[in-house]
Design a protein with these regions (language model features):
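Extracytoplasmic beta-strand/coil segments of soluble accessory domains associated
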Residues: 69, 73-110
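N-terminal periplasmic "start-of-domain" segments of outer-membrane beta-barrel proteins
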Residues: 31-61
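A beta-strand signature from Gram-negative outer-membrane beta-barrel systems
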Residues: 126-172
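Membrane-embedded beta-barrel scaffold of Gram-negative outer-membrane proteins
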Residues: 301-313, 431, 458-516, 521-525
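Flexible loop and strand-edge segments within Gram-negative outer membrane beta-barrel domains
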Residues: 22, 208-214, 223-236, 242-331, ...
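Gram-negative outer-membrane beta-barrel transporters
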Residues: 344, 482-490, 509-593
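Structural signature of Gram-negative outer-membrane beta-barrels, strongest in the C-terminal barrel
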Residues: 341-489
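C-terminal beta-signal and adjacent terminal beta-strands/loops
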Residues: 586-593, 601-603, 612-658
């Protein structure tokens, strides 16, 4: 109880000021309506002081992006862990840091997962997404909650904006159907009820059998089988509103619900493809965001969120099996940000966040842990002529406890960061950044029976980046953008599971890793009358090495599941008849463990897909028909060892806008 009281004392003893909506520097026009920024998002990414990569809705269409996993392959530095099929869990790590170090923001508010620390991105479809932004280091927008700065990399999911001011109802109806029993209806309704108030409602359902065929080779013997126990039923609904309470203030809100009942296919071994496991994931959250511009120099942003999530796991083999368990987590979260821009060169932000998390389960060993978190961020940004410099100091305080037992160690840390951008030429920018951050252990790492340890320290990370960006014209009808970033990352006190005895593993701080890498991207567009050709490529090199123990035979091995080389590319042709895009990605060889035994080797792979689409009018409604072929050459491969990915598949999408 004392820890909770101290958390509130710290939170509310901080001087509360108010503030104005100018998220970066004077000279960039802002509007309260939909909180839009007049400068093109791609242009801002190229001028950012830290690497920032954007995929907007049009990019996804012209590049033939089919789903969230496909979109993530188009972003540099990302390593995707995919268990296969429409219902397979999908998590991402960025530049070798691991999935627990990747934050995910949904409409400006960070998603929470206090149990495992990993966000499953398979639950977020692209049908309601306006753009995806990957930021490595500090965000160019400093008017953000303090929590948004607590990870080495952040994936921002921005949903479709509210409707225009025509006061007419707008509706989108869509149906997807595809291989392996896949079907997904989607409906979105939006309307401005007045020139100040608008709302939107979204509903989505996904069903898939996921019974795709696969092949295993055992010497000269070939085994052909189909994935089983892989069915999923998933539903998602959300309601959004936006209310301009005055010409200088705005209130927005979101209510979100997700429910997914899925079977869990097990690992595939020779002569074994049996699994009866099932998992039901449920998630509800509601959030409010309020912004007020007090003057030309001062703005304030406040938000609050409540999150509830349940994971109901059934082993399915023996009723009441010891591994069966229902897990429930909750979070209450609030944030206040104050922005002050005294002149056209300087802008300052102070943000303070408070969160309360707890977790309980049906396991007899459950200790019902909880955590109070206070995060403060002080940021300064300076811009003059061709130079932009940003510095941040982040203070994090974690107060841990358990209702039935002892809590983990409390943690507090100061984390600095510094970044800059310099305009060498009108189309050419140089950038450099440095950031320190740390990750508190998850509840599983602290409290899970036998596996967890209350004595764990936080993982510490350091990241250093230097890069160059270019945006210009090769001719009057050909545009080119390109980026190249060289980086060095270091992780110390890495949390790893180690064998305590023959049967029990325990988490300990023993790991150390160093990552040296290179990210390169390029995108070109050429227009000829009613024809447009677009090409986009990205390449990543990640030399992610295990530097835990120089005496170990596994020292300097590539980290598990981290490919040395990866890349993706697409080519699109828009024309008056049928638009076409060809896309593909390739991943180098990997190992499923740091020991690099022959049995843990995973071959590299490449995959190619094709898309055709056409948009046309049927009276006033606008129709769009799209046909995708994934894994065009029917390649057999694995991303996670012993979890085969689907071969060739198709998907038909019919979309109507009224």
């Amino acid at each position: 109880m004392k820890k909770i009281l101290w958390s509130f004392v710290i939170l509310f003893s901080i001087p509360l000021c108010s503030v104005a909506q100018t998220d970066t520097i004077a000279g960039k026009t802002h509007q309260l309506r939909e909180v839009t920024i007049s400068k093109d998002r791609h242009q801002r990414a190229l001028q950012s002081t830290a690497p920032m990569h954007v995929l907007n809705r049009r990019d996804m269409l012209t590049m033939g992006v089919t789903d969230m996993a496909d979109a993530l392959h188009r972003l540099p530095g990302i390593t995707l862990r995919d268990y296969g099929g429409a219902g397979g869990m999908k998590t991402v790590s960025v530049r070798g840091f691991g999935a627990k170090h990747t934050g995910v923001s949904y409409d400006g508010v960070m998603l929470s997962e206090c149990q495992s620390g990993e966000i499953d991105l398979s639950r977020y479809s692209l049908d309601n997404v306006d753009n995806l932004t990957l930021t490595v280091g500090d965000n160019a927008d400093i008017f953000i909650p303090a929590r948004n700065a607590t990870t080495p990399a952040t994936l921002t999911i921005q949903t479709l904006r509210q409707p225009s001011d025509d006061l007419q109802p707008h509706m989108t109806a869509q149906l997807k159907a595809g291989s392996f029993g896949y079907i997904s209806p989607f409906l979105r309704y939006e309307q401005c009820l007045s020139n100040r108030f608008s709302f939107s409602a979204v509903g989505e359902y996904v069903y898939a059998e996921n019974d795709y065929p696969y092949t295993i080779k055992n010497g000269v013997e070939t085994i052909n089988d189909r994935r089983n126990n892989s069915r999923m039923n998933s539903g998602h609904a959300e309601l959004n509103f936006l209310w301009n309470t005055s010409s200088t203030s705005q209130l927005g809100g979101k209510v979100y619900y997700y429910d997914n009942g899925r079977q869990l296919p097990g690992q595939v071994f020779y002569y074994s493809n049996t699994s009866r496991e099932s998992l039901r994931d449920r998630n509800f959250f509601g959030q409010l965001t309020f912004q007020k511009r007090w003057s030309e120099h001062l703005s304030v942003k406040w938000l609050a969120k409540y999150n509830w999530a349940a994971s109901l796991y059934d082993d399915g083999v023996v009723a009441g099996w010891v591994q069966d368990g229902d897990y429930y987590q909750r979070e209450a979260y609030t944030s206040l940000a104050v922005l002050y821009a005294p002149d056209s060169h300087w802008v300052f932000d102070y943000s303070v966040d408070y969160a309360y998390n707890n977790l309980n389960s049906t396991l007899p060993t459950d200790t019902r842990p909880y955590r109070n978190t206070v995060i403060q961020s002080a940021t300064a940004k300076f811009h003059t002529g061709r130079l932009t410099v940003m510095g941040r100091l982040l203070y994090s305080l974690y107060l841990n406890g358990a209702c039935d037992g002892d809590g983990a160690e409390d943690m507090r840390r100061l984390s600095p960061s510094l970044s800059l951008s310099f305009e060498l030429l009108p189309q050419l920018h140089l950038r450099a950044s440095y950031k320190e951050i740390f990750r508190a252990p998850t509840f599983n790492e602290n409290y899970f029976f036998h596996y967890g340890s209350k004595d764990l320290k936080a993982e510490n990370t350091q990241q250093l980046n230097a890069g160059v960006t270019y945006a210009g014209k090769l001719s009057h009808n050909t545009d080119l953008t390109a980026t190249a970033d060289l980086y060095y990352n270091k992780v110390t006190d890495m949390i790893q599971g180690v064998p305590h005895n023959m049967f029990v593993w325990t988490c300990m701080n023993i790991g150390k890793a160093e990552i040296l890498g290179l990210d390169v991207t390029a995108k070109a567009a050429h227009t000829m009358g009613r024809h447009t050709l677009t090409a986009a490529v990205n390449y990543s090199m990640q030399r992610a090495r295990n530097h835990t123990n120089p005496e170990s035979p596994f020292y300097d091995n590539q980290l598990a599941y981290m490919p040395l080389h990866s890349g993706a590319g697409s080519l699109g042709w828009e024309n008056p008849w049928v638009n076409i895009s060809i896309s593909g990605h390739a991943i180098g060889e990997r190992w499923s463990t740091n020991e690099h035994q022959n049995s843990t080797h995973i071959n590299g792979y490449s995959e190619v897909g094709a898309t055709i689409w056409r948009r046309f009018h049927i009276g006033r409604p606008v129709a769009e028909v799209r046909f995708d072929v994934k894994n065009l050459f029917d390649k057999q491969y694995e991303i996670v060892r012993n979890y085969p990915m689907p071969g060739r598949s198709w998907q038909l999408t019919i979309n109507m806008k009224f």
